């Protein structure tokens, strides 16, 4: 993967505005445990519509894209929460989503993606890893590719968790 310039605070702030109405502003709760002078807080991202913070990044990436690039739909390469985030976001935006998975992906993961409206494309595991690590393209795929980890908008969207933590617990 190519190195990225560090994200700026403004990118996280824009993402925070961008995900309004889709991602839930989850609570930050203190865990009640007696550990020598230690405070532990939990950010309850399990309350997101897909049960994961990955929704934040997927939504921000799609809402930040040029609408013309979304006309053919979106696709990603993931076996789990990012795939569900892209599928959920695409369904909400009324566009097509395809998820490229390794051919040995588990039935439960595939069922969750399909339940959210995603089309599934199975490919050999080695090709799937190459797609994520190097090529970011695959024959026959159309639409906007949303990389599950190295997409700048995905990173900014997921980083909105940090902004919420700072708002709820400024002295963190």
For the regions a language model picked out, list residue spans one by one.
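PLP-dependent amino-acid enzyme catalytic core
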Residues: 1-172
């Amino acid at each position: 993967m190519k190195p990225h310039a560090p994200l700026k605070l403004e990118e996280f702030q824009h993402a925070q505005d961008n995900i309004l109405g889709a991602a839930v502003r989850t609570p930050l709760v203190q865990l009640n445990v007696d550990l020598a002078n230690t405070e532990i807080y939990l950010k309850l991202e399990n309350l997101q519509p897909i049960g994961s913070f990955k929704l934040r990044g997927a939504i921000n990436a799609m809402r930040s894209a040029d609408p013309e690039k979304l006309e053919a739909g979106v696709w990603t390469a993931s076996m789990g929460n990012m795939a569900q985030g892209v599928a959920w976001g695409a369904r909400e935006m009324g566009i097509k989503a395809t998820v490229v998975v390794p051919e040995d992906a588990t039935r439960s993961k595939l069922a969750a993606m399909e339940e959210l409206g995603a089309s599934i494309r199975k490919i050999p595991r080695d090709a799937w890893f190459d797609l994520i690590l190097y090529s970011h393209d695959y024959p026959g795929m159309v639409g906007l590719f949303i990389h599950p980890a190295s997409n700048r908008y995905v990173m900014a969207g997921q980083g909105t968790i940090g902004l919420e933590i700072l708002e709820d617990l400024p002295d963190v």
